[in-house]
């Protein structure tokens, strides 16, 4: 059995590129940055860049490719964003039309790729601080929810923020806030702690993306801004084309989580 937690990003990306890994990437390449992916045509790229700049909690930019290039030169020189993500989603005019493991058949020379910070990147810091991460413990995808929180619009792009949730034992909440606040480029501190209904979540057991996590007695749901927000934006804004990673199936970068730490 492969020890994915201790393999290098390049090794894991090679396996993903050969379609030998096809599952959520949480816990893989321990200590390395993971990233959300958004790909749009050049004519929408400035609007999306502006949208991300106006919404840094949910869309912190790590890298942007040249037009027509699928190589993220800052985060993984030599990698190929057409094949090095385990699963992609294709949105056309707001509709999810396909979910694929390779983008070769969908690639166009006018596309621009954005890598956005992902909260998987601060999970190593949480584990190092003895804070449990339920979806890693139970080997499932992190739960994600569309909230009632409006993003700051830019050009064509507008809609609701998506959040990820991790149940945290009540005595460890302060420690969880401290651990994640060190990483603003991968969502940073939580945006909400406690009652899900305050941010428009009516059923904590039915996430919009990912899998439900068990919330045990004495635990509190804690919510972080999430890089799946652009997929909510795609459904609302209905751009001609937006390609993303499938929620939880991230791009694994070469730099380490600690490279993004501010403290």
From Swiss-Prot:
Keyword hit for Lipoprotein: no
EC number(s) reported in the record: 4.2.1.-
Domain of life: Bacteria
GO terms, molecular function: lyase activity
Stored Pfam families: D-Glu_cyclase
Entry keywords, A to Z: Lyase
Family indicated by similarity: Belongs to the D-glutamate cyclase family.
Record-given protein name: Putative hydro-lyase Psyc_1103
Organism: Psychrobacter arcticus (strain DSM 17307 / VKM B-2377 / 273-4)
């Amino acid at each position: 059995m492969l020890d994915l937690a201790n393999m290098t990003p390049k090794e894991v990306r090679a396996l993903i590129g050969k379609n030998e890994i096809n599952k959520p990437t949480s816990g893989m390449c321990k200590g390395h940055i993971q990233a959300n992916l958004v790909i749009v045509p050049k004519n929408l790229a400035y609007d999306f860049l502006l949208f991300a700049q106006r919404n840094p909690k949910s869309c912190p930019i790590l890298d942007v490719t040249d037009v027509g290039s699928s190589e993220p030169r800052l985060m993984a020189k030599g990698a190929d964003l057409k094949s090095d993500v385990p699963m992609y989603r294709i949105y056309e005019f707001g509709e999810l039309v396909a979910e694929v493991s390779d983008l070769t058949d969908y690639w166009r020379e006018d596309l621009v790729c954005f890598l956005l910070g992902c909260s998987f990147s601060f999970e190593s810091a949480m584990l190092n601080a003895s804070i449990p991460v339920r979806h890693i413990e139970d080997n499932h995808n992190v739960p994600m929810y569309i909230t009632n929180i409006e993003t700051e619009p830019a050009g064509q792009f507008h809609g609701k923020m998506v959040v990820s949730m991790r149940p945290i034992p009540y005595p460890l909440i302060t420690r969880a806030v401290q651990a994640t606040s060190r990483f603003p480029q991968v969502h940073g501190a939580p945006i909400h702690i406690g009652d899900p209904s305050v941010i428009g979540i009516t059923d904590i057991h039915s996430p919009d993306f990912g899998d439900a996590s068990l919330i045990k007695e004495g635990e509190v749901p804690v919510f972080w801004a999430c890089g799946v927000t652009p997929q909510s934006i795609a459904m609302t804004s209905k751009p001609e084309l937006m390609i993303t990673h499938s929620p939880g199936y991230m791009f694994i970068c070469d730099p380490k989580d600690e490279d993004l730490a501010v403290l």
